[in-house]
Swiss-Prot record:
Main location: nucleus
Compositionally biased residues, Polar residues: 74-95, 952-962
Positions with biased composition (Low complexity): 626-637, 939-951
GO annotation, cellular component aspect: nucleus
Protein name (Swiss-Prot/TrEMBL): Protein lin-36
The gene coding this protein: lin-36
Taxonomic classification: Eukaryota, Metazoa, Ecdysozoa, Nematoda, Chromadorea
Protein task: Required to negatively regulate vulval development. Antagonizes Ras-mediated vulval induction. Acts cell autonomously.
Location relative to the cell: Nucleus
Alphabetical list of InterPro entries matching this protein: THAP_Znf, Vulval_dev_neg_regulator, Znf_C2H2_type
Keyword Cell membrane in record: no
Keywords: Developmental protein, DNA-binding, Metal-binding, Nucleus, Zinc, Zinc-finger
Length: 962
């Protein structure tokens, strides 16, 4: 825009608005910035003049560089220090920023604007839509200062009761001054924050100590809103927060530059000229029309489509005469399609003051259009794109002109230069090819990876063979001699092994892949073949060790050091993963217990326990903890079943092994990977059974040895409860596991681990807490005796006297499980009887006559000594929610409520409620009160069955199974 044009109209710029970057070299900005608020108030001047008379809307004309960008004195009178005042600000720091108020105040009542239904506001803003009596003053910079009338007499959501700083510019607002808050709607809050110069993360709540702080909570002063915004929404605070926006540029705000740093210019339709300024192009086109009119002959070559307006859509027709074209260009900007859209968008965002008055072209400068549309200053390094060929000005030659507009080839070419994405105008053929190419590439990549993996697997097998041998030689050698490289290993494997040791992973662990010296590592041998090989190796162990010893001696200390380091590393890994392995072993053990044999084979027990014991006697530091013996009988049971078919072979192996001193040699343990190999390296090492022992690292796993799983009548005192062969009740398993854990727990500080299944309390009640009889409790209720269990066709009665109120759920658990598994186990253990006292109910499936009352008494005494036991149990019980219990047990709501009430009574008053009983039937658990007639029926049925069983004890138990 030219200087002359600027001087023809008074500048209405807000001098406090922009802080011009000092390095800004774009001269267009400094010229055009004079029009930021041109006509900011003109849209409302007429209305104002009725009420206020003459108002100085314009302000004084001042030189561009004397703009005070930030006041040196705040409204509260505090003077800013020199460091805060930039050279530009110092130029006219003598005058404070905004304290000059022009004219007298205007009284306004801010009723809610009628075009909006207030009920729709709740999501947009928290401010109530009520109106207030306001006093409006206009500042010298064109902004408004608004006060709530009588604010000192009443509370108003419009104003702060005290002096508060504005969140945006830190100007301290006076008491009673109107402020606005950020919208409640998150999208609009983000838009406001962007316009007010905040980043998105600034308006998120940040937790500072106990206080949750957010910029979006603070008040915003009226400086940051145009008068247009207040007028549009009738000064109503809630309407402005719901639908208005702050002004594009406001004092002390450096707005974030728009993401759109490139701009497509407007193009002249007559010549090659193009410009980003609407006014410039309009004057340029008017000049064209003047020249055309001046032509003497007045015979003009009118283009085929007519004279086109660059500010209107291409589809609109052109003007056939120059005068018509000129008239159209002189019409106001809002009569041109594209410009009208820009204006409406700006008005919607309360930024139309940048472009007002609507009929004037003067304000449509490059900067103002950008600010009105985007809401912030154009970036200093803005790129002006060259106009595309299709938008090029009309050429004088009509043939060329039609060719340019209608040339299909050109349009196709433009489309082709785009990428091949379908939406962007590329061909679908292209897309298909690309997709296919991608698929082929993917397949090829996978194939390559597979082949590489196979090669590396073969390589590592060889390396691991030598590595494994070294590990075992170390544990074998009595004279503390280890070989530098085993004779069976490939030539360079000694060097390679050093590198591979550190990177040993679960896939190529030394424990899993062991090389045989008869068979090459790559050829996998069948189990039968493997057995033969192992026999051969076992029969002549001595020559090998004899051969080895001479080669070893020279590099002995270094080798030992390296092996020691490797062992330490392995031990660290073991320590880290022992928990997971413990869980894995438990899971496998309990999953496969039915399928597996009752006793692990003796040979296997020997292999691990005695064999490693022998090793540890030779090398004191390689003593084996229970952690290594633990899983053998359980984890490898599947393996035993598969690979060691006959006891004779096993015993043969055992006999040959016994004399040999270096027991833990690679030979006896060579095993092919199973069909479904164990995932972790550690688990595999447990199955393999032999590796450098790690006693000094002490990673204890709770041992569960063969003796523990055998169980006998009196083995109970040791804390292990036996189970009948095929029963798999949770009660039995749990008792086995927990009691084992409790009995074998050495340190008093440790709490027994409560394992994955849900806990069942084995002692009927805490002996210490209540003086009532512990295990003879069933005699206290007249209907029951220990010898005669009562069954009502799958419906059990548990007297409330006989149980801890807290443990009701657990009882129901066990009852539910036992009743569901009744039928499954009936054929095998016909002598088992369902017991109805708590202790017996818990051991329902587990007790095949082995658990006597005295034994139970002993166990419970043992357990009561250990305070940790109850703590662990309670923890485990608390973990399970009532919802889970209900899902498991199908408890009726009523029953749950009753149980909860009973628990609460017990907790509060310590009373034992004996007026109800839990009645578990096929329909789910129910709570029966003694008043219920069904209670009597059940009692009678139980008594009858009791009598029957006394007469025919065998028949009674078989009945109960059905």
């Amino acid at each position: 825009m030219s200087e002359e044009l600027l001087s023809t109209r008074p500048s209405k710029r807000d001098y406090n608005d922009i802080e011009e970057p000092e390095d800004s070299h774009v001269t267009v900005h400094s010229v055009e910035q004079d029009s930021q608020h041109s006509g900011e108030e003109s849209s409302t001047v007429d209305a104002l003049q009725e009420t206020e008379g003459d108002v100085d809307v314009i302000g004084e004309d001042e030189d561009e560089h004397d703009i005070p960008v930030m006041p040196t004195v705040t409204s509260s009178g505090e003077v800013l220090d020199e460091s805060q005042v930039t050279p530009t600000k110092q130029a006219s720091s003598s005058q404070p920023r905004e304290e000059i108020i022009h004219g007298k105040g205007e009284s306004v009542y801010s009723s809610f604007p009628c075009q909006v239904i207030p009920e729709t506001l709740s999501r947009m803003t928290r401010t109530p839509p009520d109106g207030e009596h306001l006093e409006v003053y206009r500042m010298s910079n064109g902004r408004l200062r608004i006060y709530v009338v009588d604010h000192f007499k009443k509370f108003s959501p419009y104003s702060n009761l005290t002096h508060k700083p504005c969140t945006v510019c830190n100007r301290v607002m006076k008491s009673g001054e109107m402020h606005l808050n950020f919208p409640a709607d998150l999208d609009r809050r983000r838009i406001w924050a962007n316009l007010l110069g905040f980043k998105y993360k600034d308006i998120l709540r940040s937790k500072m100590g106990p206080v949750s702080f957010s910029i979006a909570a603070g008040p915003i002063c009226t400086e940051h809103f145009a008068e247009e915004c207040f007028r549009n929404h009738n000064f109503n605070k809630s309407a402005i927060e719901a639908f208005g926006v702050p002004v594009a540029i406001s004092p002390d705000v450096k707005t974030t530059p728009s993401k759109k740093s490139s701009r497509v210019p407007w193009v002249c339709t007559v010549c090659e000229f193009h410009s980003c300024s609407v006014v410039e192009l309009q004057t340029h086109l008017l000049n064209h029309t003047e020249e055309m009119l001046k032509k003497k002959d007045n015979v003009l070559d009118v283009p085929e489509a007519g004279f086109m307006c660059p500010f209107c859509r291409k589809c609109t027709y052109g003007y056939k005469t120059i005068s018509g074209y000129r008239r159209h260009l002189n019409a106001g900007p809002i009569h041109h399609c594209h410009l009208r859209r820009i204006y409406e968008f700006a008005k919607m965002n309360c930024r139309a003051t940048e472009l007002d008055p609507a009929e004037s072209w003067d304000n449509w400068t490059r900067r103002n259009v950008y600010v009105a549309y985007h809401g912030c200053e154009p970036p200093a390094n803005e790129i002006v794109l060259t106009p595309s060929p299709t938008k090029k000005a009309y050429v004088q030659n009509p043939e060329e002109r039609t060719k340019m507009v209608h040339d299909e080839e050109k349009r196709k070419k433009a489309v082709r230069t785009l990428s091949f994405v379908g939406k962007e105008g590329g061909t679908s053929v292209n897309d298909l090819n690309v997709m296919q190419r991608q698929v082929f590439l993917q397949l090829r990549r996978e194939a390559e990876i597979n082949t590489k993996a196979e090669e590396s697997a073969q390589g590592t097998k060889e390396q691991e063979s030598s590595q494994k041998k070294h590990a075992e030689e170390e544990s074998d050698d009595v004279s503390e001699l280890t070989s530098h490289q085993s004779p069976q290993a490939p030539m360079g494997s000694g060097e390679r092994r050093k590198a591979t040791r550190l990177a040993t992973s679960a896939t190529n662990s030394p424990i899993k892949k062991v090389a045989k010296h008869e068979v090459p590592a790559t050829a996998p041998s069948t189990p039968a073949k493997k057995r033969k090989i192992s026999h051969e190796e076992e029969h002549d162990p001595t020559p090998e060790s004899v051969e080895r010893e001479p080669t070893v001696s020279p590099n002995d200390p270094r080798e030992r050091l390296r092996l020691k380091e490797r062992d330490e590393q392995f031990a660290k890994m073991v320590q880290k993963r022992s928990q997971q392995v413990k869980r894995l072993i438990n899971a496998k053990q309990f999953k496969k217990q039915e399928a597996a044999t009752k006793k692990p084979r003796k040979a296997l027990a020997y292999n691990l326990a005695k064999g490693i014991a022998a090793t540890s006697s030779t090398e004191p530091e390689d003593k084996v903890t229970s952690s290594e013996q633990t899983p053998e009988p359980t984890t490898s049971q599947k393996f035993i079943a598969r690979n060691t078919r006959s006891k004779t072979k096993e015993s043969a192996v055992q006999k040959v092994e016994k004399p040999a001193t270096p027991v833990a040699k690679p030979a006896p343990v060579e095993k092919e990977p199973e069909e479904r190999p164990l995932k972790s390296m550690l688990a595999r090492s447990f199955v393999a059974g032999v590796r450098p022992s790690m006693a000094k690292y002490q990673i204890p796993l709770e041992s569960f040895t063969a003796t523990a799983s055998l169980g006998g009548g009196r083995s109970l005192s040791s804390g292990v409860i036996s189970r009948p062969p095929t029963s798999s009740s949770p009660g039995g398993i749990f008792s086995q596991r927990v009691m084992g854990a409790v009995a074998q727990e050495k340190g008093p500080a440790k709490r027994p681990s409560v394992l994955s299944r849900r806990p069942l309390i084995l002692s009927p009640r805490k002996k210490t807490s209540t003086p009532r009889p512990t295990l003879s409790h069933h005699e206290s209720s007249p209907n029951f005796s220990a010898s005669s269990p009562v069954v009502v066709s799958d419906e059990y009665l548990i007297p409330a006297t006989d149980m801890e109120v807290e443990m009701v759920e657990e009882v129901i658990d066990s009852m539910g499980n036992s009743s569901s598994e009744d039928v499954a186990t009936s054929s095998t253990s016909s002598e088992r009887q369902p017991m109805l006292t708590l202790a017996e109910a818990l051991e329902m499936d587990g007790s095949s006559g082995t658990v006597k009352d005295q034994d139970m008494e002993e166990i419970s005494k043992e357990m009561m000594k250990d305070a940790h036991y109850y703590r662990a149990m309670e923890d485990a019980i608390k973990c399970r929610t009532v919802t889970k219990m209900r899902a498991d047990m199908r408890l009726s709501r009523h029953c749950i409520r009753q149980i909860e009430a009973a628990r609460a009574r017990a907790r509060l008053f310590g009373e034992r409620t004996e007026d109800y009983q839990i009645f578990y039937s096929n329909d789910g658990a129910q709570v029966l009160t003694k008043k219920d007639p069904k209670w009597r029926e059940l009692q009678q049925q139980q008594q009858q069955q009791q009598q029957q069983q006394e007469q025919f004890p065998g028949q009674g138990s078989s009945d109960s199974q059905q």
